[in-house]
């Protein structure tokens, strides 16, 4: 038996030996992984340089404002187009050209105007009359009436026809409506194209569809933004409620851990049960209603999610999903009921540790602020990089011409050879790009920007884990609690992490960042290859995505435990990761049962908080609470604030529970070390609490017993 035990330990490393000088986290330690610290500092300097370059060349106005054929912004304050907020297309029918899908521009002149045309008028009719004063505001800036009509229309100085239009996303689109099933614009069922020909309204519809297709995503974003502007304070109230519930839950957990865990389990089951009941009631209510039996497949994707709530199949799907979750949770609770008692003991011990280090509950705010700083820098740099291209002008024409698609200069295009080669062609703004070294490097800079975001974000999370681990390890290794607990354990752990272990944190976060950026690239390639019919390529891509997902999960698990060892012993990252991994492998059964059951209980706590706040938000924003029915704001998509509240509530609950989770993981690792280092004798007493000793049938022997 002893030989087997020796072989087992040899296979998974050597257990920690008794050290009479060890009293918890080592204070006299040296710097670790200095090379990685230097690399991180150099990378940050380079990241700042990239940000400065991007801010120098970038122009976010290119995202906000529409751009005319000369590359000038419509509605931008401080410019000559400050009062011209709308983009007007000379001939929107040409937007039906396939060129729109290739160049993302309609092959027709576009100008900025103060307001969209509100009457039907042709250039031939307006020319030489008083109505031309109204008409010429839709001609190119600086137009002078010294050309023949044919020259004006050929050169694209004025549109051939004005059609009643309405603004949509700062663009002028024909005001098309249906009257008794017939499409009309104004009071007409057809229109004159300005060249003496009558055309059908459907031509306008096709042109408007193609032009509008480019803007649908932006229009959806604008409607979502409108919902945020009228509901942001209610969203904040919902997040505050989630914060209060999380804090209240953790305070109660400190004093009533056992009762709270069982109450939490029962409440989650009841919440899911109510969800099943509500889905069944909605399913029954829709029986017999017109259109409620349409299948989800036949309906297809709809941006207005309220449409799905009028289908019986939707509520049936919800009911099945919730029922499956209910059965899974009940079965897990039945088979893990004995292990739950052990997990409760760990949570109680963690509650005591958090009680002695109460400032640890505020540390997630520090992590949150640092992450917000990383996100803000990454997002602003990405926007400035994406808008740092120069305006590129190309030749557009609705005729077949060799020069179409070539770059041009709008200043001298009328005197160029391409203009004479392609009569009726226009040199207009196409997109933002460039051929300089900087512009060719933009994709690489965007990848570097994303990589640095992952690295710094993971570094911030690692700093928080090491800080909390150091504080809670100080609690565990205090033989007489709380008398032997050092003053300000959280601040001491934070200082040690930054002073000695910045390099180790940079090393661990670098490994994770590399895997994450590879996963992002794989997702990008997967989107690009979706149209391909190569089954082997799809299979290979799926395998790669799965492998790197598993690798990321493993590295996160290994890093977390390595950071605990760094906080305790002050060793470098590789040594800490190896020791933590072998320690866990020597106690793999305890890891699988105790640690993961505790994680499961914390997940149930998050679901309870998120579910409660989510249900409250659903009833509020759908005007189903009669007391505050008139208080809820009118919305385009009520799911926007509901999803925001749900995601925000989860992040808040996760922030609070992450402290508890780190505490449990730290105490668990310290507990395993305690079992290997000590034997309960006077010389080598156990540091674990009396509760854990009773739970594991361990005791510290008294002098007479020794």
Swiss-Prot record:
GO terms for cellular component: membrane; mitochondrial outer membrane; plasma membrane. N-glycosylated. Keywords: Antiport, Cell membrane, Glycoprotein, Membrane, Mitochondrion, Mitochondrion outer membrane, Phosphoprotein, Transmembrane, Transmembrane helix, Transport. InterPro entries: Choline_transptr-like. Residues 1-33, 254-256, 337-364, 462-504, 585-599, 660-706 are cytoplasmic. It comes from the Eukaryota. It is found in: Cell membrane; Mitochondrion outer membrane. The keyword Ribonucleoprotein does not apply. GO terms for molecular function: antiporter activity; choline transmembrane transporter activity; ethanolamine transmembrane transporter activity; transmembrane transporter activity. Residues 55-232, 278-315, 386-440, 526-563, 621-638 are extracellular. PANTHER family: CHOLINE TRANSPORTER-LIKE (SLC FAMILY 44) (PTHR12385), CHOLINE TRANSPORTER-LIKE PROTEIN 2 (PTHR12385:SF34). This is Choline transporter-like protein 2. It comes from Sus scrofa (Pig). The lineage of its organism: Eukaryota, Metazoa, Chordata, Craniata, Vertebrata.
